[in-house]
Every structure is written in C-alpha cells, then in structure tokens.
Amino acid sequence: MWLITASGAVRTTYQYKTHAGASTVHNRVAASASMNGPRRLVTNVAVPTLTSGHRALHFLPDRVLIREGKNFAEVPYQRLELTAEPVRYIESEAVPRDGQIVDSTWQYVNVTGGPDRRYKYNRQLPILLYGRLTIWDDHGLHMIWYVSRAELAEKVAKALVNASSVPPPIIQP
C-alpha cells in the first residue's frame, strides 16, 4: 500500500523514453492499514486506519479523523467524495507478493515502446494491476492511495459509501 504524495504528466519524448513509457510519474510513500486508532483517542470500537509517514486517516463511526503531523482535522462521511478504480502501474521496485502482473515493459523504451538498445543495462519491468482509491472533499482534502490488490480499493470505497449513507448523530445540548 502506498500514498501518492506528488504526480506529474510525462510530456516530452525524452521523459517518455526514460520513464518506461509511462504517461504519469508518481512520488509515493509506503503506507499501511491497521485497526489502531489515534493513540490519544479512547474508543470502545476498533478504528480502521490508513497510515503513511506523518499522515493518517482514522475511520471513526461517524467521521474521518485526519492526522497530518501533530495537527488533526475531521470530515463527516457525507462530505467525502471518492473513487476506486483498477490501474496499470509500472513497478520499478520489488513486486508485492499479492500483486497481479498483467504485462511488462522496458526501463528505457524507444518511441514505438520496444527496448532502447542504446542502454547496456535495460531491465524489463513488470506492469501490475493495482487499485487506486482517491479520497477528496471540497475543502482541500485530496489523497490518492494505491493498493496491490485492485479489488481491495473497491471494497474500501463501498464501505465508505455505506458509512456516508448513515445520518450524522444529533447532539442535544
């Protein structure tokens, strides 16, 4: 699992050739999923959490608690927008054990997509089918998470959609 921290489009022929023919380049950080909520919050339920470095999403029963370093914010499920989709990803690092390889390409490609024979060490890279979960709202939240099994992103998205259909609690003074 990874959190995408930056991405950019491949625009020039040189970029296309040196990025294995990819159309977009990502900077990603390793992430993990757990059932541990924030340390300072005591709950009587397990809190599903996605963590990556100093960022975390804690899925509480009525809202999402977002941690960025020492700062916290909350977003009701009703304000969240999300998409889940399978994506083809050129993997230049170690292939996850549960990853599904669907194709392969070369580290350095020519314009037609074949191997660029000018490079002595031009390794073949696997193309995997990953799941992309995008979570955003109208107030600035925009996070893209990649998971090594495409169907997991869809399951998480369905669970979040179901959580958003539950009306928020009414707090009486």
What are these regions (language model features)?
Residues 1-173:
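A composition-biased, non-transmembrane "mature-region" signal
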